[in-house]
Amino acid sequence: MQTFDLEAQGLRALNTALHAQPGSTNQTIWEILNPKRAHALAVGLDAPIEVNIKGSTGYYCAGMNKQATVHVHGSVGPGTAENMMSGTVIVEGDASQYAGATGNGGTLIIKGNASSRCGISMKGIDIVVKGSVGHNSAFMAQAGHLVVRGDAEDGLGDSLYEAVIYVAGRTGKLRADCQAQELTCLLYTPDPATSPTLFA
């Protein structure tokens, strides 16, 4: 395991080291200490590595992610997993505004709540929020799935295209092109044994 102290070594050195990892790297597990809400942590990754961030982050954590798994053991600032292409981003705490914005693929799991505009303009990403989401979530969502185990505030799905939204709790006022329907058939039931991150 590669251990990196962000306070001592700096953000530029961290992202440079992560970007240098080839697809065949043996340095597959990274632990980042003392993030102290730094911005742009682990952005633009493109290798099958696992990055564990031990604390909360600022803006744009794990943006433009490809292949990598980024696990934040804390909360995240605005724009987490923005324009994500593939891989997995897991947030143990809460997420600020526009988490998963414009995401094209991959999976974003938020175990707390997500603020406003979660999944705005999503284009294929799958987002699971264990808590609730703020106003205007999935605005102009074009493809992908938003699963909310809590409540959704006003403006959910405004100008929705072909994305699918599931809400276990209550919803506020729905906007244009978003229609409420009863769930009549669940095609896929995740197994807690094989998908533990969804149930932890």
What are these regions (language model features)?
Residues 115-123, 133-142, 152-161, 168-180:
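Thiamine diphosphate
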